[in-house]
């Protein structure tokens, strides 16, 4: 294999939104970790990556070859002496977080997308990223898919919030969510940091994701010089991995 590292988005790429990877995906990732380095760079939290992916990998998976980048690359964790260690975390200040949360409340109310009966938290302060979920963090997948099938409501919210927060990066996350990080802290930042710290050049990396459209949280990766593959489901990703093995 000419590639030295394969980087994956999580929701919609390796697994359904907020769901675990399949048994077939877990086996395929274990096989991939045996032959190359793998990075998971997701808008989700460290806990979500651990729950959805790491905890589902078969015993004996080579975790030394696994890099974790939660919150869209704003954090980086690496296995060190049998434990996950934080390499960096680009967190908001309390004042920044307060301003972002205030703008999200105002924008969602203005556009009529604040839910009356949310499934869990609507605004999730993840330290290095703040995520707005239009139906709540724990909404069923079927309801999320039905809420905004053409993505117009989510994209309108993203544009509105971005216009009010020009000093931050605002991107589409999952099917009903938008993600906000510090300016310049996105998945391209994560890829650049990964290259710098692993000494792997961008042309030796393949990125796989389902939000590579402009405004999507995978889109910044396109400008980094890595090869990239747009997928539309975890099933498609599984086929891609098997073809790489």
Walk through the language-model features, giving the residues of each:
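Mg2+-dependent phosphoryl-transfer enzymes with acidic/Ser/Thr/Gly-rich catalytic loops
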Residues: 1-3, 21-22, 181-183, 187-245
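A general structural motif
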Residues: 1-3, 35, 63-65, 127, ...
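Active-site phosphate-binding/coordination module
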Residues: 20-119
């Amino acid at each position: 294999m000419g590639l030295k590292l394969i980087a994956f988005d999580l929701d919609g790429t390796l697994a359904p939104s907020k769901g675990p990877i399949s048994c077939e995906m877990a086996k395929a990732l274990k096989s991939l970790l045996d032959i190359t380095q793998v990075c998971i760079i997701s808008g989700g939290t460290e806990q979500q990556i651990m729950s959805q992916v790491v905890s589902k990998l078969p015993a004996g998976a080579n975790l030394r070859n696994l890099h974790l980048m939660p919150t869209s690359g704003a954090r980086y964790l690496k296995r060190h002496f049998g434990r996950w260690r934080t390499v960096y975390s680009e967190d908001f200040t309390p004042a920044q977080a307060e301003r972002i949360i205030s703008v999200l409340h105002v924008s969602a109310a203005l556009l009529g997308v604040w839910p009356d009966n949310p499934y869990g938290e609507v605004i999730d302060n993840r330290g290095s990223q703040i995520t707005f979920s239009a139906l709540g963090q724990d909404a069923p997948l079927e309801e999320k898919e039905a809420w905004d099938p053409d993505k117009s409501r989510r994209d309108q919210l993203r544009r509105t919030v971005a216009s009010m927060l020009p000093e931050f990066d605002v991107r589409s996350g999952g099917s009903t969510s938008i993600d906000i990080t510090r300016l310049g802290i996105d998945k391209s930042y994560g890829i650049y940091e990964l290259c710098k710290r692993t000494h792997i050049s961008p042309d030796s990396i393949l990125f796989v994701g389902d939000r590579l459209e402009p405004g999507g949280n995978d889109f910044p990766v396109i400008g980094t010089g890595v090869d990239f593959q747009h997928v539309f489901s975890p099933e498609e990703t599984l086929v891609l991995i098997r073809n790489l093995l």
